[in-house]
Amino acid sequence: MAYKVSKDPRTDIRERTYVPNLLRGLGITAKHFFRNLFGTRDTNTQVVDRTGASLMTTVAYPEEKPIYPEGYRGLHRLVPREDGKPRCVACYMCATICPAQCIYIEAGEYEDEASDSEDRVIEKYPTQFVIDELRCIVCGLCVDACPKDAIRMDTYTHTPPEYTRQNFVYDIPKLLKGAPVSHPSDPWNKREGSEEPHHVHKEAHTRIGEGLVELKLPHGEHGGHGKALPAGAQAGHQAVVTQQGPIQVTKFIK
């Protein structure tokens, strides 16, 4: 049985040419064009507060920039101390918790002859702190995990465009921005009425070298822990100082 093809019921020439709908769309475009051309649109009021003829969903970026909501996770930044150094103590907590593994840190240790500021109390600092913004999934776990409030995502700006992928890898000079802040975890803020020390010896700490761990205690304390000991009974272990002396713990290796 043959199938009978029906003709297009739109026999009107105006409907076939789409002229009415085309003119209607051009009219809307022209209306907004002349409204913006003669300055009838209010551009001084923030986008979220506009009403009437100025209430438009389209934002003329970059002349106008939308307001990011409170709590927006923007670009990362490293928070500086008063001396300009990053607050980061190279604890690797942000790099460990990052599900995208976009954070890379290399730690350095302050020498005993360092300046008489908080370097005597804070042991480590990052010699390298790198974030690959292309791999970041903007989850904010690094901010939550940091015990020193050293990394934040409160820049309220998105990742700007770049010409190469390497430009999306942010290092310390690119991340270190913003005003210095204080944090309750600072050693001189742990007790009420205490001040930032000018000369304080470090507490007992562990320094990891090539196969040896150098254990240092404050002057006047003894107990046989001031010598260099093997880093562990087997590979993948390191010694840690406690009140009872060095103990062996398993070192997590990626």
Swiss-Prot record:
* Reaction(s) the record says it catalyses: a quinone + NADH + 5 H(+)(in) = a quinol + NAD(+) + 4 H(+)(out)
User: Can you name a GO cellular component term?
Assistant: plasma membrane
Where does it live in the cell? Cell inner membrane
Q: Which residues form the 4Fe-4S ferredoxin-type domain?
A: 78-108, 127-156
What keyword terms does UniProt attach to this protein?
4Fe-4S, Cell inner membrane, Cell membrane, Iron, Iron-sulfur, Membrane, Metal-binding, NAD, Quinone, Repeat, Translocase, Ubiquinone
Q: By its UniProt entry, which InterPro entries does this protein fall under?
A: 4Fe4S_Fe-S-bd (IPR017896), 4Fe4S_Fe_S_CS (IPR017900), NADH_quinone_OxRdtase_chainI (IPR010226)
Protein name listed in UniProt: NADH-quinone oxidoreductase subunit I
Q: Which organism is it from?
A: Myxococcus xanthus (strain DK1622)
**Taxonomic classification, please?**
Bacteria, Pseudomonadati, Myxococcota, Myxococcia, Myxococcales
Which gene produces this protein? nuoI
